[in-house]
UniProtKB/Swiss-Prot annotation:
Microtubule inner protein (MIP) part of the dynein-decorated doublet microtubules (DMTs) in cilia axoneme, which is required for motile cilia beating. Residues 50-131, 183-251, 342-405 form a coiled coil. This is Cilia- and flagella- associated protein 210. Microtubule inner protein component of sperm flagellar doublet microtubules. It holds the Pfam family TPH. Keywords: Cell projection, Cilium, Coiled coil, Cytoplasm, Cytoskeleton, Flagellum. One of its GO terms (cellular component) is axonemal B tubule inner sheath. The lineage of its organism: Eukaryota, Metazoa, Chordata, Craniata, Vertebrata.
Length: 547
């Protein structure tokens, strides 16, 4: 139902001209849609319309009011938060203060930890330096020369202590002459023993020096023997090269003989092929003779078959005659229908027999024709094979001549290749000799650099040792200068502090021979347990290798 503003239904205004309008078309107002029956429209007052509209929009209006209240509350909450954000007597303020205090404490603890870590790092660095210095001092004290110096220091202290004890005993038993004499004898005996020990050590040093000189002479003899061996190896290499050239010439002459032999065999083979061709022609004639005999036998078989067919035909005629006689008897004895059936069977049998005879004759003619065609094709194939054999023989001869020419070219290339290889080997030998000389020179320079560095390191160690020994001797000499001789003697034994003889060409150094293991124990002398030939290139030359 459509509702419009206006009068109520059924209360139309009376007018005099209504009748005239009823007959005409009633125009629709602009607010009404077209094609609407005005009698179906209900008109309500404005207050009623407002009430209806308010009832329809109530939910929307209430939702808008709720949203406005919620927005106002949220705005008030934000304003309250901004207002109490810096207050300290609230839960949030106290929580924030606690967090800040905790963060500050953590930062202070972290700063203290960093300071402690830095102090610990400095302490560890100092400990490491102390450990390194202690290890260096320990390593310095473990050297043989320092050990010998410490032995001298200990000997001087022992001698000083012994003199103190002797003096004490002398003062205690001064009246005992016998004891004094005994002490004197003991001193003389000890002095004599010291002299004997010193003489023994001197003899040992002389023996060690003689042993070293003997080893040097042996090394010189070994070097001379090695040079002689190398010269002998060079002569042997020249002899081997000469034998190799002679062997190559023999191989070339042998290959030429093989070429001549192969050429001769080729000619003999061609002669044998002519003989084989004659034999094959004879075999072909024999085969033709076999074919002719086969044709004759085939003709004989055909004739026998024809005779057999004639005999069969005669027998069939006799059988037909017997059948006719029998049928003539049956005609008299049986009914007409049976006679007709028998006559029809006989006629069919005769037709079938004639058909078989005709097929046999056609088959015989076809066999004869096939035999003639086969013979003609065989003769034609023989002629074609003979012509093809002649062509192949000619081509084979040309191929042999071409192969001979190619073989000669290959032999020529091989000889050139052998010459080039010899030249390359010679160049390689020259280059290898130059490389070996350069390597030997380089190794010599490296060895000289090593000895120079060793000398510098020895001088530095000698200065360090002298400084240490001077400080110790000065400290010990403050109390007494009488017993400083063992320390001075240990210091003056020579540079290096080893047990070997001093090397005059290297500043008088006495080398310290050590074991080849991790202990580094001082050895009394040098003794090599390895191979004498530790040079790889020299070992190869000694064994005869040239690469």
């Amino acid at each position: 139902m459509q509702v419009r503003f206006g009068r109520r239904s059924g209360q139309a205004k009376e007018s005099q001209g209504m009748d005239c309008f009823e007959k005409e078309e009633i125009p629709y107002p602009p607010l009404l849609p077209s094609k609407v029956d005005l009698q179906q429209i209900t008109i309500i007052p404005h207050a009623e319309w407002e009430r209806i509209r308010d009832s329809l929009n109530r939910l929307t209006r209430e939702a808008a009011v709720l949203r406005a209240e919620r927005a106002a509350k949220k705005k008030m909450h934000v304003k309250s938060q901004e207002l109490v954000k810096h207050w300290t007597n609230t839960y949030a303020g106290m929580k924030e203060q606690k967090l800040k205090a905790k963060q500050k404490r953590d930062e202070e603890i972290e700063a203290e930890r960093k300071v402690l870590d830095l102090e610990e790092e400095i302490y560890k660095e100092g400990e490491r330096k102390k450990a390194i210095e202690s290890a260096r001092q320990c390593q310095f004290h473990q050297t043989e020369r320092v050990k010998r110096f410490h032995s001298g220091l200990l000997l001087s202290r022992v001698m000083k202590e012994r003199d103190v004890q002797i003096q004490y005993k002398k003062n205690a038993v001064k009246s005992d002459k016998k004891w004094e004499e005994q002490v004197k004898l003991n001193d003389e005996k000890a002095f004599k023993e010291d002299q004997e020990k010193e003489e023994k050590r001197r003899r040992e040093r002389v023996a060690l020096a003689e042993d070293h000189l003997k080893q040097i002479e042996e090394h010189k003899e070994e070097e001379e023997a090695r040079k002689k061996s190398e010269e002998k190896d060079a002569e042997e290499m020249k002899r081997q090269n000469l034998l190799y050239e002679i062997e190559m010439k023999k191989n070339l002459s042998k290959k030429q003989e093989e070429i001549d032999t192969n050429r001769k065999l080729l000619l003999d083979n061609m002669h044998n092929k002519n003989i084989i061709r004659a034999v094959e022609q004879q075999q072909q004639e024999e085969e033709d003779e076999k074919i002719r005999k086969f044709i004759k036998a085939k003709k004989r078989l055909i004739q026998m078959r024809m005779d057999k067919d004639a005999e069969t035909h005669r027998l069939m005629e006799e059988r037909r005659e017997r059948i006719n006689n029998f049928l003539s008897k049956l005609i008299k004895e049986k009914l007409d229908t049976e006679d007709l059936i028998i006559a029809r069977d006989i006629s069919e049998a005769d037709a079938e027999l004639e058909k078989r005879e005709k097929e046999k004759h056609e088959k015989n003619q076809a066999d004869l024709k096939a035999i003639a065609e086969y013979r003609a094709s065989v003769m034609k194939n023989k002629e074609e094979e003979e012509r093809q054999r002649k062509i192949e023989a000619k081509e084979q001869l040309q191929a042999v001549l071409k192969a001979d020419k190619i073989f000669q070219e290959l032999e020529k290339e091989k000889s050139l290749k052998v010459t080039r290889e010899k030249l390359e080997i010679q160049d390689a030998h020259i280059q290898q000799i130059a490389i070996n000389k350069y390597n030997a020179k380089q190794m010599k320079e490296e060895e000289l650099d090593y000895w120079r560095l060793t000398d510098a390191l020895t001088v530095e160690k000698e200065k360090e040792f002298e400084k240490y020994a001077r400080e110790v001797i000065n400290f010990e000499s403050e109390s007494t200068k009488k017993y400083a001789y063992p320390m001075v003697k240990a210091v003056q034994e020579g540079v290096g502090g080893g047990r070997g003889p001093p090397f005059v060409g290297r500043g008088g150094i006495r080398p310290s021979y050590q074991a080849t293991d991790a202990t580094g124990v001082q050895l009394p002398c040098f003794k090599s347990q390895g191979s004498k030939y530790n040079d790889f290139q020299k070992s190869k030359r000694r064994l005869g290798f040239t690469w």
